[in-house]
Structures are given as C-alpha cells and as structure tokens.
Regions:
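Surface-exposed binding/hinge segments that line
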Residues: 83, 126-169
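Extracytoplasmic/peripheral linker and loop segments enriched in polar/acidic and small residues
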Residues: 373-384, 411-480, 506
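Ligand-site clamp/hinge motif
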Residues: 200-245, 373-375
C-alpha cells in the first residue's frame, strides 16, 4: 500500500516526525561546535571552487585581503585599509597578522599568492581575473600596490572571495598555510574535518570557539535528524521541506535568506547546444512554477531572466519575463534551428542534493513535451563537479549564487573566455558579452555602469549562455544556544562561514 507514496510526500512527512533528543548535548566538548556539512569537500585547496561545503571549511582556515561583515558590507580583512590609487591601481595596507606556522603575513606573501593564481598552468577559479594584473608593487612588508591593466572597480570584491585567500609564500602545494581563525587538526576523507582555534589569530578575543568538528551528512534528512537529536549544533543546506518544522521547534533556530538560484548550463562545443536558438528553446520550455513547488516546497520564486535580484540597483523589470514559459515558441525555435522533431541528449545533475535532482526531473519532463529526450545522469556531488569541469554533458543542472551582489558577480557564470568550471557552460563563448563585462568592471560611474549592464543583460538573454530557473531560499539551522553565526544576505550566503570566528556554543 506504500508503493505509490512519492518522494515529496515521504520527505515532507519525515521532516515533521518528532526526533528523540540524544544525550549528546550533555556530553559536548566545551567550546567545540559540531557542524553538519551537506557533503565532504571534494577538495579544500584554497584557490579552487569545489562547492559550498569546501568554501565553509576554507573560511575556517584561511583569510583574504578583503571580506564581508554580517550586513554584507565589504570590509578590509588581512588588509587594514584599501583605497583606489590612480586610474588603474589599488593600494592595500596590511594589518599585523600571522600564518598558522607563526610567520608574519607580508606583502611578499600577497604578491606570491596572486602570481600563483594567475600562473599559466593554474587551475584557480579566479585565474582569468588575476591575469588582469599588470604588476604588484611591494614597497615594504605591509604595503601592496596592485596595478591592473585597465580600471577595475570590482577588484576589492574579487579579493573578498573565499576562493582568493592569502597563503604563506613557502607553502608546499599539498599543505597550504593559511592565516584564518582555525588550524586544520584532523580529517577522515568522506567523514569529518576537525579544526582547532589558532592562538595567534589577529583579531583579539577570536575565535570564540576552541574548535569545530565538521561532519559530512550527504543525506539531507539525516542531517536534519542529527540537528533535531542534538548530535550536531549547526547545519547548512536546510532542506526546504524541513524549514517549517525547524522554525517551530523551540530548541532550534532557522536563519534563511534568498539569493541562490537554480539554472541550466550547456555544452557549446558541439551540436545542438552550440546554437543559441536551441538554448533559448530550452529556456522557454521550462515551467518554472513546478520547480518552485517540487524542489523548494514553495520557498522560492521563478527566475526567467539573468539572476539579478529585484533588490539590486541594476535590476531591469522590463526583462524579467524574457525566458517565460512558452512551449509553442520553444518548438518554433527548434524548427528554426533545423531540429523540428527534437533530439536526445545527456542531462547531468546529482542525486546528492534533492533540489538538483528534483529540479532536473521537472526540466526533463518539460523538455520531453517539446521533443527533447534528456537522459539524466545523477552521480554524487564530487563526480558531478569533475564531469562539469570536463564538459562531459549536453545539459547540466546548476545551483549557486553570484560571487557577490554586484552584477559583475555573474561574470564567472556567463563569461565563456574563463577557464572551464562546473559552474558555467562548457565552450559557450560570446565575444561581445565578454567585452561588455570588461567594460562594466572598468567603469566607476554608477549611471554608466547601469547602462552597460542593461545592454549586457539583453545580450545574455538572447544568447542564453545559461538559463535561469528559480530563486531559492537558502537556510542554516542551529540549536538555540549557538550564537554569533549569521547567514549573510543575498548572493553572499555561501560566504557565511566567515562568521564562524564569532560563533559560540553553550
């Protein structure tokens, strides 16, 4: 009699079940927070992008020149000041800080780090951006002057990314030495990572914790159960079907924000998705309301344009329905592209995150209605990342947030001139789009920047380097006696690990 119960019905019911509290809260290690991660990080190499769980761990161990406060405002970090210096240069004055080996953080370490990221054989996420540096001057140990090849208003925001931490210049490749609030203590691949407080951290009184034990719970329902049972203090990626029950639990607290989104990526190195008409056909084939219902239990909204939030000064309401659901138009575009009968293609997603799997299944059904048979591939997250980086798919499901709340934060998702990454389409390069992104980051006048990005968005909607699907609520949940940790607003939610330095438990 249970054979016809859907996954959605099951998880919604399971989320509402009362879990017996364990004795773990009574046997906590004082001052140690247990964090339930959504996956074991594929890599915690400092300059690579391997997902949010990895980013959270990197924010425990490392710090960059810049970062964000709890309100999402850009602030100096290892730098104590940042100022524009002429048309193309930025001047940073370093604070007195130490790496985990006791060595001081110096301008030479900053110069070495940025040169490694920009190196020809680098696989760093920000490699292309750092290749825009003309020279790095280090007049003394605590002063860095970065001269760009062209004016770059966005450099301080790039340097706030958890993909751009400063590493000790004599580090071995397998053991990068950071300057963050915690030091790597132990790890068991696939299971846990432990860090302990760094006694010489440059902020007085921080970190407030003695350590953090990060445990991987790939199953989202087990992750919630662990929190409800008291086995962990804090979890990321609260499943949407569990948000209501967690919000009502007097022992727990939910901290959620809107900002991340789901989207589609394409392999543009071969037919059929090297044709923008086919990509736009896919865009018009998707009934986005069904994704919001199936994957996010209504805790989200449709996204039929580039992911620029309506809270942004750069939002253009005239374009908000550009990729609206219109299956007749989708079929017309397929016919114009010479594929009136449709085709078969591979569709990469992952079974490890329910929102990726559920969103992909909705898209698969919608595509079938216009003649596209999309064959799903649902590996674990680490495999999904590797396949995406290598372009081993025709269509792929993506889920992320922009790098920051500036429209240039979308560049890493839509600029095909950048090195391959699972977060952007493979081999979809639109020269004019790249040119406009460069123009936007070179323009310091707000009105002129706004005009550039409006034109850029219109071009991106026509070329469809990615296709937006749905905004989603992104939540962390914690026990009531956890304080100091905050979910940063909007696109910065994945930077929230920066606040672990202020977290306390008990």
């Amino acid at each position: 009699m249970f054979a016809n119960i859907s996954r959605r019905t099951f998880v919604a019911g399971a989320a509402a079940l009362p879990f017996i509290r364990s004795a773990r809260a009574a046997t906590r290690t004082p001052g140690v927070l247990t964090f339930g991660l959504s996956s074991y990080p594929p890599s915690i190499q400092p300059w690579q992008n391997t997902g949010t769980a990895a980013g959270t761990v990197k924010l425990m161990i490392h710090r960059g020149l810049m970062s964000y406060d709890v309100a999402g405002k850009l602030r100096p970090e290892l730098a104590e000041s940042c100022a524009q210096d002429g048309a193309t240069a930025w001047l940073f004055r370093l604070r007195q800080a130490s790496f985990h080996n006791g060595e001081p953080v110096t301008s030479a370490d900053v110069k070495w780090t940025l040169e490694q990221i920009a190196a020809e054989k680098s696989t760093a996420y920000f490699r292309a951006e750092m290749q825009g540096i003309d020279k790095i001057e280090t007049p003394d140990d605590r002063t860095v002057r970065i001269v760009m090849r062209q004016p770059t208003v966005t450099l301080p925001q790039w340097l706030a990314s958890f993909h751009l931490p400063i590493v000790w210049r004599k580090s071995e490749a397998a053991q990068p030495v950071g300057a963050g609030p915690f030091v790597l203590k132990a790890q068991e691949r696939g299971v846990f990572i432990e860090v302990e407080a760094f006694a010489k951290y440059y902020k007085p009184g921080m970190p407030r914790l003695k350590g953090i034990r990060a445990i991987a719970y790939a199953d989202e329902n087990l992750r919630v159960a662990a929190l409800q049972a008291g086995d962990v203090d804090l979890i990321e990626y609260v499943p949407w079907q569990s948000m209501e029950s967690i919000g009502k639990d007097e022992a727990l607290r939910l901290d959620a924000t809107d900002g991340p989104f789901m989207y589609l990526l394409f392999n543009g190195t071969k037919p059929p998705f090297n044709d923008a008409r086919v990509r736009r056909a896919v865009a018009h084939a998707v009934k986005r309301e069904d994704i919001v219902k199936a994957a996010f239990f209504g805790r989200g909204s449709t996204l039929a344009h580039l992911p620029i939030t309506d809270r942004s000064d750069f939002y253009n309401g005239e374009l908000k329905d550009s990729w609206r659901y219109d299956p007749a138009l989708a079929r017309k575009l397929l016919a114009e592209a010479g594929r009136p009968e449709g085709f078969t293609c591979s569709f990469l997603s992952t079974a490890q995150y329910g929102m990726h799997k559920d969103s992909a299944e909705v898209v698969q059904q919608n595509l079938a209605a216009i003649g596209i048979k999309a064959e799903l591939n649902l590996p674990d997250w680490a495999t999904r990342v590797n396949l995406g980086n290598r372009g081993q798919y025709d269509i792929a499901m993506g889920g992320t947030a922009a790098d920051n709340n500036d429209p240039d934060g979308l560049a890493n998702l839509i600029d095909g001139s950048l090195s391959p990454s699972y977060v952007r389409s493979f081999g979809v390069w639109i020269a004019k789009l790249e040119e406009m992104l460069r123009a936007g980051r070179a323009e310091f006048d707000p009105a002129r920047r706004k005009a550039i990005y409006r034109e850029m968005e219109a071009l991106a909607l026509a070329e469809a380097p990615i296709v937006g699907l749905a905004w989603r609520s992104q939540g962390y949940a914690m026990r009531k006696d956890v304080s100091g940790f905050r979910n940063l607003p909007g696109a910065l939610t994945f930077q929230s690990g920066i606040t672990l330095e202020e977290a306390q438990v008990g």
